[in-house]
Amino acid sequence: MKLLLAVVLLSVCLGYVFGGRLHRLESIRPRWWGLVILGLGIQFVPLPEGVAGTDLAIRTAVLALSYSLLIAFGLLNVRMPGMFLVTIGLACNMTVIVVNGGMPASAQALIDSGQEDVLAYLQDQGADKHHLLTDDDQLTFLADVIAVPQPIGQAVSVGDIFVYVGLTWLIVAAMRGWAPSARPEGSRPRRGKHRRGATREPEPLPDFGFLPPGATTWGTGR
């Protein structure tokens, strides 16, 4: 949680550095945001007594359902700046969790991040979502093997990095004035052959929040 808050604060600072304004964050209006609430909420629902510790299949299925909902949200909003990175990160985390029945956490990463108490807890009884990384785990490069030192104190995965970078991109782009593009009502793209000798106007590049202000294509002022 501390790392997430730090990423958000850093993103806001970067937004100001690039000429953004905080009030423009209201332009972030994702579709189907209820999938995020449902997907995250599933992870906090207590499983029946004994299931979390003994029934690996049910535990894995619950986590897979949670991440599936979050990935669906990312795909439905993939045109938003940075959302494709968030979706990639979620897919990476889901893959390693499903393959290993939970997210493996490196003991060394926990030590380097100052989480000896978490290490002792996982060694003693484990957790619903995490377990200590072992030689039997697969795709360990996607596990929680990256240590973020104190004062953050957290072990993260490659997927987490993708999510945080995508979130930063989204916040900075929104603060700089990004807004969802909308086609005028009743307008349709022209089809068919162009008249001979006619020149086609260059199509605008997709705006991911980093085009110069007022520009529709790179290298143009209007």
Please report, for each region that a protein language model flagged, where it lies by residue.
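Membrane-interface loop-to-helix entry segments
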Residues: 58-65, 155-165
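Long, low-complexity, intrinsically disordered cytosolic termini of multi-pass membrane proteins
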Residues: 186-222
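Interfacial segments of alpha-helical transmembrane regions
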Residues: 69-99, 104
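A cytosolic-side transmembrane-helix exit/cap motif
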Residues: 52-56, 81-86, 103-113
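Structural signal for the C-terminal ends of transmembrane alpha-helices
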Residues: 12-22, 73-81, 171-178
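Extracytosolic (periplasmic/ER-lumenal) interhelical loops and adjacent juxtamembrane/interface segments
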Residues: 111-155
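Transmembrane alpha-helical insertion/packing segments
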Residues: 1-66
